[in-house]
Design a protein with these regions (language model features):
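N-terminal beta1-alpha1 cap of cysteine-dependent amidohydrolase-like domains
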Residues: 1-66
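Short, surface-exposed connector motifs at secondary-structure boundaries
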Residues: 12-17, 72-73, 133
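Short beta-strand segments
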Residues: 19-20, 69-70, 138
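Short, glycine/serine-rich, charged loops/turns that create anion-binding
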Residues: 23, 73, 107
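Flexible gly/pro-rich beta->alpha loop and the following alpha-helix that scaffold active-site loops
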Residues: 42-99
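Class I SAM-dependent methyltransferase SAM-binding "motif I" and its flanking Rossmann-like core
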Residues: 78-143
Length: 143
């Protein structure tokens, strides 16, 4: 999936912004992600909300070819993005042609909703996604 997202940019050296909000912006997750994207020939930056938000989310996201969003709690991700205006910045990036992709929470967030374990051990509906795609997304449907 990662290579498919990178190929959609049609760039030899895509500019990628990592957004790992759903997992709490863990430094080890960033390190592994930087390693993977650098190995794939990308220029990498990040947009963090912990412990302090990165400045200029709209400019940071808009200057990239691909935004890659990691997994974790989609409920926390959506709440924090809305609090910090990242939701609007993501929409603007998408409308400007930036490829938006990700895994788990980083996949559900683009849709109207889907299922999540963000509220407890069982899958529950999440219905307040960004709505960039007018569908539901069932990640982890087999787990």
């Amino acid at each position: 999936m990662l290579l498919d997202a990178l190929s959609m940019t049609e760039k030899l050296r895509p500019r990628v912004c990592l957004v790992l909000t759903a997992g709490g912006d863990p430094s080890d997750y960033y390190a592994v992600s930087y390693e993977a994207f650098n190995a794939a020939g990308c220029d990498v930056t990040e947009l963090k909300l912990f412990p302090q938000p990165s400045a200029g989310p709209e400019e940071r996201l808009g200057s990239c070819d691909l935004v890659w969003v990691g997994g974790g709690s989609v409920a926390n991700l959506l709440a924090l993005w809305r609090l910090h205006g990242v939701d609007a910045a993501m929409r603007h990036a998408w409308e400007s042609g930036v490829i938006l992709a990700g895994v788990s929470a980083g996949s559900v967030c683009w849709y109207v909703g889907g299922t999540t374990d963000s509220f407890g051990p069982t899958l529950e509906p999440v219905t307040n996604g960004l709505g960039l795609l007018p569908y539901a997304n069932g990640v982890h449907y087999d787990s």
